From Swiss-Prot:
Name of the gene this protein is made from: eIF4E
Alphabetized Gene3D superfamilies for the sequence: RNA Cap, Translation Initiation Factor Eif4e
Taxonomic superkingdom: Eukaryota
Protein name (record): Eukaryotic translation initiation factor 4E-2
Posttranslational modification: According to the redox status, the Cys-120-Cys-158 disulfide bridge may have a role in regulating protein function by affecting its ability to bind capped mRNA.
One of the protein's GO biological processes: defense response to virus
Subunit structure, interactors included: EIF4F is a multi-subunit complex, the composition of which varies with external and internal environmental conditions. It is composed of at least EIF4A, EIF4E and EIF4G. EIF4E is also known to interact with other partners. In higher plants two isoforms of EIF4F have been identified, named isoform EIF4F and isoform EIF(iso)4F. Isoform EIF4F has subunits p220 and p26, whereas isoform EIF(iso)4F has subunits p82 and p28.
Keyword Nucleus set for record: yes
Misc. remarks from the entry: Displayed sequence is allele 1.
Organism taxonomic ancestry: Eukaryota, Viridiplantae, Streptophyta, Embryophyta, Tracheophyta
Positions with biased composition (Acidic residues): 21-33
Length: 222
């Protein structure tokens, strides 16, 4: 892993410095036009990503035991350029600053971070665990690897989620075709390499998780 991430210069850096974060995962501007200004076509020389991506936030204060799973997840912002990614990323709380119980997602646009989404339905996820407050850098590197199309089997990737809990944080990388063992193992190995992560990581099918909950076993490990 490199010691420092070299961030592209944001063309809107002077604007984003004036934005405030109202709550975990939400950007608030001084006017209704704040968010739309991120995608202003008059801003020249932005670097387009291969896919558009959407940040989603699951606010722990909006959850209840009676509510259906995923009912409190809401989209935050969709970006499609390198510059807009940094504009958003630099103005939201990183995992170490999120409240316990929060889930923050980054998925390809039009894919919802839910098992029920048609693209995710037959998929699964790789998961890495970290001590509380220790996942910030690996979360960023995961995002950069995804949006930068660094995975050989990148078409298999749906998105990633960071789960913040009392004693630990977990980053999960969701993929679309769990039965494609070759692709999933390739993704798992590359992910570990990108993050310089030395512990074993496991892959669980969403279908197993739905049926067995925490009793679901890893189908693949790297």
């Amino acid at each position: 892993m490199v010691d420092e991430v070299e961030k592209p210069v944001s063309l809107e850096e002077s604007k984003t410095n004036t934005r405030e974060v109202e709550e975990e995962g939400e950007i608030v501007g001084e006017s209704d036009d704040t968010m739309s200004s991120l995608g202003n076509p008059s801003m020249a020389m932005k670097h387009a990503l291969e896919h558009s991506w959407t940040f989603w936030f699951d606010n722990p204060s909006g959850k209840s035991k009676q509510a259906a799973w995923g009912s409190s997840i809401r989209p935050i912002y969709t970006f499609s350029t390198v510059e807009d990614f940094w504009s958003v990323y630099n103005n939201i709380h990183h995992p170490s600053k999120l409240a316990v119980g929060a889930d923050f997602h980054c998925f390809k646009n039009k894919i919802e971070p839910k098992w029920e989404d048609p693209v995710c339905a037959n998929g699964g996820k790789w998961t890495m665990s970290f001590s509380r407050g220790k996942s910030d850098t690996c979360w960023l590197y995961t995002l950069l690897a995804m949006i930068g199309e660094q995975f050989d089997c990148g078409d298999e990737i749906c998105g990633a989620v960071i789960n913040v809990r009392v004693r630990q944080e977990k980053i999960a990388l969701w993929t679309r075709n769990a039965a494609n063992e070759t692709a999933q193992v390739s993704i798992g190995k590359q992910w570990k390499e990108f993050l310089d992560y030395n512990d074993s990581v496991g892959f669980i099918f969403h279908d197993d998780a739905k049926k067995l909950d925490r009793a679901a076993k890893n189908r693949y490990s790297v």
